[in-house]
Amino acid sequence: MKFNKIVALALALVMVFALCACGGGTDTTNPDDSGSTAKVDTNTVSVGAVVIARDDVPTDEIYAFVSTIFENLDAITAQHAKGAELSLEAAASVKGVPYHPGAAKYFEEKGVKVDAVKEGAGNGTASALSFGTGGESGTYYAFGGVLASFVSGKSDCKVTALTSGGSQANVEDLANGNVQLAFVQSDVMNYAYNGQRLFDSPVTGFSVVAQLYQEQVQIVTTNPDIKTVADLAGKKVSIGAAGSGVYFNAIDVLNAYDLKESDISAVYQSFGDSAESLKDGKIDAAFIVAGAPTTAITDLATAGSVYLVSLDDSHVQSLLAASPYYTAATIKAGTY
């Protein structure tokens, strides 16, 4: 009997050591009320990921770009999971900024009508297209590279994906002729077109190609005690590059919880730098706005447990009421 007790104790100790050894995992969850981790959905808001083009890109080039993508969604999805989120209805749903004639032509052939078409666009000379995406640790770059490679290989439209500083930089590069195509957040696109927030005057020399998927506002932390946005008060938080789309999304969310920028210790970093700072313990949390799963968070999760902070329903509704660019969103448990 005494021997059996010794064996049982030994087995229990082995299990404890095994659990301790596995403590830092890739479990991206958000903490429940007890402070432990729970595999649950994360409620948040999202903005659209939109491809825009310079007005002088020829109609045939944009038609080839859009048609090649939407006629080959299964093959694209096999290369990147975001392909599964694309639909004709969502692609043609943008309002407030007119569509490029090449995109409108394809959508209308498929029986989907866009809200407005840019007059006088599409009359430039055909050439290879540079596609401004985003930083290497974001979804824009990864998915943009897949789209560029696929379109170039399956059509006469030749596209090269380039890294960039994100939405605002992409609009500026597009306006300056450095790129012909670009990814932008839907809210930043409208700010540019109307000369608001990030932009001192309207930027109107572009038109919509397609809205491809939703970009979730993801609040990431390695601290399980940060359970709500209110818990960010007094913490060191990365809120994106100063003046970026992420910055304004972060400010909107903080304001919804009656927090000002001065109520946190704000740092202004890219997705990749935010992930590195979280891993090194230099910051407490970070706002990352990108289609989930996002490379920066996935990579961070390989180094230890990370948590997504959920927005409660009342604050989601406040954000929806305050801005026409937000949509309620859910990041499913197990995404990371």
Functional labels for PLM-detected ranges:
Residues Y99-G102, V114, K154-T163, A169, ...:
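N-terminal secretory/targeting leader peptides
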Residues E89-Y106, A126-K154, Q214-D280:
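Bilobed "Venus flytrap"/periplasmic-binding protein-like clamshell domains
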Residues G145-S149, T160-S201, I219, K227, ...:
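Pocket-flanking alpha-helical
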Residues S46, D60-I62, V66-L129, D273-A275, ...:
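An extracytoplasmic/periplasmic, membrane-proximal ligand-sensing/linker region
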